[in-house]
């Protein structure tokens, strides 16, 4: 009963259906993925590479990324790489391909400053000074890595839900101003410390039912506040 993919457009169409049915993403988010994948497909056609996604390898993707780096910001590059990675994760999951050609490709650093305009050196110094043996240390490290690595606003971070995390695709679903939805890359360190936090400190917390899906909690088991985030940063 195995289905074989014939071309890129068919594969993108199946992926969009997966995002809608399995991931429950909004039409806007799905179209954002589709747009980025069609940009990559345009590059495939322009350079006369194979119409079969199974023939795509890491070298082709690296050349595309290099091409994109000349015209797009690191943030746009990161989003497009995440989209391509998620697409190939899906193809791997469905056994259309054996290995993901993006596995060894790094996502560009977004390099966005924290909300209170700390410099990169200040952020690194602060991260190194976090006491990971302290009960809230892992949570605070996860918060800083997510704020910096994914370029989130404090208001976006405190409202993040467990259901917003897609570890396999290295993506976070964020709801910004006006409840506008977008997908942002999840950095390796952010992913690492969120997972440690969820398996340890958060798991031991007495969580208020209302906040059972909220990621970052205070000692009382409710959503961490903006004020607390700024105290952590400072």
For each of these PLM feature ranges, what is it?
Residues 1-234:
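Conserved catalytic core of the tyrosine transesterase superfamily
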């Amino acid at each position: 009963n195995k289905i074989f993919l014939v071309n890129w457009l068919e594969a993108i169409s199946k992926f969009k259906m997966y995002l809608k049915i399995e991931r429950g993403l909004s039409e806007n988010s799905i179209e954002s993925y589709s747009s980025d994948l069609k940009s990559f497909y345009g590059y495939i056609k322009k350079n006369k590479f194979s119409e079969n996604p199974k023939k795509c390898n890491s070298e082709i993707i690296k050349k595309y990324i290099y091409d994109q780096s000349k015209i797009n910001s690191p943030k746009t590059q990161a989003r497009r790489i995440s989209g391509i990675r998620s697409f190939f994760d899906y193809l791997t999951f469905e056994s259309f391909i054996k290995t993901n050609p993006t596995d060894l490709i790094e996502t560009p650093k977004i390099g966005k400053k924290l909300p209170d305009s700390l410099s990169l050196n200040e952020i690194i110094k602060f991260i190194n000074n976090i006491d990971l043996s302290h009960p809230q240390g892992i949570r605070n490290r996860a918060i800083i890595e997510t704020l910096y690595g994914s370029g989130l606003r404090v208001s976006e971070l405190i409202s993040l839900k467990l259901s917003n995390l897609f570890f396999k695709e290295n993506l976070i679903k964020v709801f910004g101003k006006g409840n506008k939805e977008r997908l942002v890359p999840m950095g390796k360190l952010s992913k690492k410390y969120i997972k440690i936090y969820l398996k340890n400190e958060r798991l031991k917390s007495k969580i208020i039912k209302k906040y059972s899906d909220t990621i970052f909690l205070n000692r009382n088991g409710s959503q961490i506040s903006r004020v607390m985030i700024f105290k952590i940063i400072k």
